[in-house]
Amino acid sequence: MTQRALWLRDPLGILADGAERGIVVSGDTIVELVPDGAAPATPDVAVFDASRHTVLPGLINTHHHFYQTLTRASPAALDRTLFPWLQALYPIWGRLTPDSLDAAATVAMAELLLSGCTTTTDHHYVFPAGLESAIDTEVDVARRLGIRVVLTRGSMNLSQRDGGLPPDSVVQDADTILADSERLIARYHDTSSAAMVQVALAPCSPFSVTRSLMTATAALAERTGVRLHTHLAETADEEAFCLEKMGCRPLDYLEQCGWLGDRTWLAHGIHFNSAEIARMAKAGTCVTHCPCSNQILASGNCLVCEMEQAGMAVGLGVDGSASNNASNLMQEVRAAFLLQRARYGVEKVSHRDALRWATEGSAACIGRSADVGRIAVGMQADLALFTLDELRFSGALDPIAALVVCGAHRADRVMVGGRWVVEDGTIPGLDIAALVRRHNVAAKSLHAE
């Protein structure tokens, strides 16, 4: 029996033009926008009363480290800048197990879903002995929860003994990394418009990966048609490292390795000059802004307005839950709005800009602008519905603005590919209390030694 199309009727607010009376979803796709004063042209629709809901395109998280939910507010890492912060946490992350990663990934993806996120990336680059199937574990969790993912096969092969930052216990050799990258692409990477799982390649950073691995990874991505991701220009320390070890600035090094192109998106992108921004724009390279992490680690502030003015796409990412200490993308939207409004002023940054970074901008980062990030006919039915019933929203008159300026943090309903994965503020089938208990045990175990 064919499932009836669903009309999300008369939303309180919706981030789409010409959809004042809602949208119609059939299967996994948006098939109709219903304008003011009209009814659906689609026959025999089921109805969801959206009159209490403000409807957004599903938010898209373009930088994260799921495993780091296990080291939130870790005493060893508080009040540190990036390099000392990493050095404090690498030994703890070296104790990760498949079970602890499963718990960490479940917490991260559940928190993202509950914040209105329908697509997330993850950058997993720590592979201690026994954790060789980390990405497979993340795929399993994503499928259980129903969230759309782009999982990046991270890597580190430049350890402390070779002049890098990480200890030997969390790095792998280049041959192992490249072989596993090929395996994951062959097994999981889906190129269809409805893809629920995709794979990208993501050497961690210039200070943890050899030049040869960076170059080989770019060649593999070109051959297999997948995207590239890495941290770049996050801190002044990174710039100094590149100048000392490579004899050039981080973006120059990236270009030398074959990475400056339209399949690449970069995390952070704080310490770029105007000429570098112009080069990235010309190449089609995108940047993910991570405001909470950048503030907590005092790394600096991404030049989002200069980037967009140059023609670059800017996305949004929560970054790791040990630097951000949260996996809430709606809160990240507000953080980006406040941080960039303070920098650029009221005429250059609005709440809609911040929402655009988390939707259309993020979709561009992962190469999926044709599928997700907008409410439009033909797009995947990925939607986040928020109510304004909480005390924090009382008196709010603009429902779209209220989500950002009043601090929305939890969606009431979330749809991914036409399927409800959050209902009444909960994830069906997921025992949150049991998950928290399991996750806390795993976190304490990592810190016990």
Per-region residue spans from a language model:
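Histidine/acidic-residue-rich catalytic or RNA/ligand-binding cores of hydrolases
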Residues: 73, 236-248, 276-281, 298-308, ...
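His/Asp/Glu-enriched, well-ordered alpha-helical/loop segment
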Residues: 256-263, 305-390, 405-406
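Alpha-helical scaffold segments that flank or form the walls of functional sites
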Residues: 73-123, 128-148, 179-193, 440-448
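Active-site microenvironment of metallo-dependent hydrolases
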Residues: 1-21, 25-27, 31, 359-449
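Long hydrophobic segments that form regular secondary structure
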Residues: 272, 276-284, 291-296
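Metal-coordinating catalytic core of metallo-dependent amide/deamination hydrolases
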Residues: 130-269
